[in-house]
Structures are given as C-alpha cells and as structure tokens.
Amino acid sequence: MAKSELKRKKHQSGNEEVKEKRQKPLKNDKKIAEELPQDEDDYEQEEENEDADQNTSVESESEELDNENEDERVQKSVNLNASSTSDIEKFSDLQLSENIQKAIKEMGFETMTEIQKRSIPPLLAGRDVLGAAKTGSGKTLAFLIPTIEMLYALKFKPRNGTGVIIISPTRELALQIFGVAKELLKYHHQTFGIVIGGANRRAEADKLVKGVNLLVATPGRLLDHLQNTKGFVFRNLRSLVIDEADRILEIGFEDEMRQIMKILPSENRQTLLFSATQTTKVEDLARISLKPGPLYVNVDSGKPTSTVEGLEQGYVVVDSDKRFLLLFSFLKRNLKKKVIVFMSSCASVKYMAELLNYIDLPVLDLHGKQKQQRRTNTFFEFCNAEKGILLCTNVAARGLDIPAVDWIVQYDPPDDPRDYIHRVGRTARGTKGTGKSLMFLAPSELGFLRYLKTAKVSLNEFEFPANKVANVQSQLEKLVSKNYYLQQSAKDGYRSYLQAYASYSLKSIFDINKLDLAKVAKSFGFAHPPNVNITIGASGRTDKKERRAGYNKKNHVDVYSKQRSSAISQDKERGWSR
C-alpha cells in the first residue's frame, strides 16, 4: 500500500514537472519560434527518433498544452478585437503575429474587404462563423488568416498532426486555396498539404503520416484518408473550414460530409462555414457542424445587386445557328484580352477547343473529364498568362481567383441565377476589380432575365452589327464534313449540349422542345442535324461515382483522343480547306 502511494506521489511530481516545463515557454513565444526546426526534414528526423510510446506521450501533452494556450489566446483575442469592426480597415489594424503580417504585406494586401473586416476579428476570438458573401469578396483570406494564426499561437508541430482542415468542392479551388496558404505560411514553421481526387493517394498518405498541420482537401479524398490512412493524426483538430458549402452539396457530397462530421472530433473545434446561398441542405450541414449560436456574417444583405461592383454586364439575343459565328468573331476581336467562355458540357468544350485550335484561334480548355494533372497545368497556365482564352464548364465557376480576367462569356446560359452570379464572379474580383460579362440568349430564353432581376442582377442588351460578324458557316460545315475525327467530336458535343439542355431545371425558359435542332446543329458545323441518341428528361450531369473516378471510360477515350489528334494534325499538314 505504502509502495503504491509512493509511486502515485512520484507520478504526480513528474506530471507537475512536465506541466511546469510546458508552461514556461509560453512567456517567450519568440524564443520558442527560434528553437523550432527550420524545415520538414528536421521534422521528419525528430519523429524518427521517437518510439511509439514517446510519440503518444508527446501528442497527449500537446493536447493539454493546446487547450491551455487556446483559452489564453481566445481571451486575448476577445479583448484585442472588442472594438467595432468599423474601426478596422487595414490588415495592419489586426492583432496578428509579425510573421503573418509580413506575408500579407508581401502578397500586396493592405485594405480588407467587407467579409474580412466582419469575420476575421470574431474568428480570432474563437467564434464559430456562418458566412454568406458573393463570389470575389475575399473569403479565402478571411478564413486562412485566423486559422494560420491559431496554428502559430498553439505552436503546432508535425508530430501534433492536423490542426486545420479546409474542405473545398473542386480540385481547382483546393489547389488555389493551397497556393494562398503556402504564401501566408512563408515565414511559419507549420507544415501544410493537399489531398484531392485524381492525385497520387500513396504520396498523400505518406505526407499525412509525417504530419500536416494545415490540410486542404476535397470531400471524397478526405473521407478516404480519414477512414483508411493509418497514422493520420487528426485528434488535435482545432479548426474546420467548409468553403462553398452550397456547391459541395450541389455536386453530390452530402453523404460524405455527414460521414466526415461524424469522424472528426468536435470538442475544442472552431468551425467556419462559408456559402454563397443559404439552402435547406446548407442549414442542415451547419446544424451538424457548427456549435449552437454561431455568428452569422452576411455582407450582401441590403445591397442593390448580387454581383460585385466594377462589373459591366450584358446579354446578346442570337439565334442558335448564329451562335458560333458570333463567338468566333468576338474571340478574334479580343485576342489580346483574357477571356473565359462557359459551356454547358464537357464534350462541347472539348469539341470547341479542338475546332478553334485547328483554325488557328488558340484556346485552352478545362473540364471535369480531363485527367487531374492536365486540369492543374491548364489552370495555372491560364492564371499566369497576360492574355488568352479559356473554354470551360462550371468546374471553373466557383471560387477560383484567376487574375485580371477581362471578359466572361456565357456561351451556354447557366441553369439558374446562382450559377450566373458565380460565373461572372471570375472577373472584377477584389476591392477595385473591373471586368465585363456577356451572355448569349436565344429569343426563347429571354424569360431568364426576369429570374436574374429577381436575384438582383440587371443586364444591358449588347448589339453586334451583322456586318461585323464573320460568316464562316460554309467553311465550318466543309471542315467538319471532311474531317472524320472532328466530325465525331462535333457529334459528341451536339449530343451532350442537348442532354445538358434537357436537364435544365427552369423548364419554362429552357425547353428542349422549343429548340430548333437544325439551327443548333449548324452551330456545331453540321448542314443537317446528325443522328444522335439522347434521353430527353434525363440528367445531363455525370454520375457521382463516374465523376469521382475521373470518367472511368479512360481506355476507350484515351485511344480515341490520340487517333483524333493524330488525324487532325495530318489534315493540317495536307493543307485541307478551312
């Protein structure tokens, strides 16, 4: 009995000693920062020198330290940010660490946007936030700055595992968030990583096991790692960010998000949920992810428009058979500008890119059926270009911050006003951004303008004189009829366009029965409508499993694409008529 008591006292004494050592460094953050390893190799070496028991002990101690330091940080942040957000205009007004202030300054940011002014202070104070803001409002910095500051304040190291998880709906948006996080973490020692569908899963798992403090992820791949990657430490999670929540749910990740919420620890976790629209599903997700009584930040309520200032918006009424001619003429006149053209289906984008590149009008294309590496390369190539044309589906419509876009062209109109708002949000971004948008509408589709007006979006009608539109219809039809592979691509594009049109939710406006198929066929280069098989009324969206697999018909498609590319190249060498 006495021996047991002696052992217990000795254990208590040891704990007090550990606690004293643990508390002491809190008085000198700068000294601790200087003692931290300088790169990931140091982290890895440190982990290799610890056995499993020591690592468990360190992680357990780290949890206690985090909780203690977090209470101190939250109280400090509440006191420092108690003043009205109207007093805070610049990032330098925030009580941030020197390292992150330096990174923000080097990135060229000085004045905060409305969403940043209203959300960063309460986030620094530890509040859960449900944010609503139009695209291009600066949400990325609004959630990255507080979460990185938290990691720094809690002295996260690789052995502590993941402290921040940011969930994004698309791979491109995840890559973009990752890029911004990398710049903000330039002067920090915390580790960061990204896990997305289409990337090398084993390489991701290896990095997670080594320790990733800030993780950017898409829902499907994140759930995979949470369930199957042994050694992925996420018990110390302190901040969860759900970006573009409405989009995540729209594209079919509702079940995955519910499973993720069940797996992730909720104790001591701050949650940030950003959504451009507040739907019933978003409210349900907020209910299971946020603590009761979150701070609701809506910077759009009461504003006269749903799109950003500095954006000049217009539409043009054009018959289906003249759509390509107008697009071709418009792009030829804007070769020195940066232009994004939205289309409704992957096959339409693919065909139009092949066609335009063939007739020496260089374009890039981005859609969901491309391999991930190509999508990534295309995205960054267009981001870094001073001028150029990008043809894409809605994969690029949400959240992506592409610099200096001059024109957004909606060649195929969107399914609803929300999609319109997100598409045009690729231009006129930031506090002083400017840009223009143009939407093509058939005479039968003009009723869509009423829906836009209800959503606080007003457009002016643009007119293009007929003598300014190049009439290349006969050359187009001749080219498509002579080139077999281009003809097959045109058929695929035509079929997928009709399938997508049939899936539109606003049937009173976008009624496939009102389409003049002969005119639609001409816009794809056919003199007469080709015979294609479509199911009217079926969804034009790909199945979720097919989408996650990256379009699993890859063997057939890859061979077909190579043959077509080779044939088109041979045609050009022969100097076929254009």
UniProtKB/Swiss-Prot annotation:
Domain Helicase ATP-binding positions: 120-296
Acidic residues bias (residue ranges): 36-53, 60-71
Compositional bias ranges of the Basic and acidic residues kind: 543-561
Catalytic reactions of this protein: ATP + H2O = ADP + phosphate + H(+)
Subunit structure: Associates in the nucleolus with the 60S and pre-60S ribosomal subunits.
Protein's job: ATP-dependent RNA helicase involved in 40S ribosomal subunit biogenesis. Required for the processing and cleavage of 35S pre-rRNA at sites A0, A1, and A2, leading to mature 18S rRNA.
Comment field on protein domains: The Q motif is unique to and characteristic of the DEAD box family of RNA helicases and controls ATP binding and hydrolysis.
Protein's name according to its UniProt entry: ATP-dependent RNA helicase has1
Record organism: Schizosaccharomyces pombe (strain 972 / ATCC 24843) (Fission yeast)
Source lineage: Eukaryota, Fungi, Dikarya, Ascomycota, Taphrinomycotina
Gene for this chain: has1
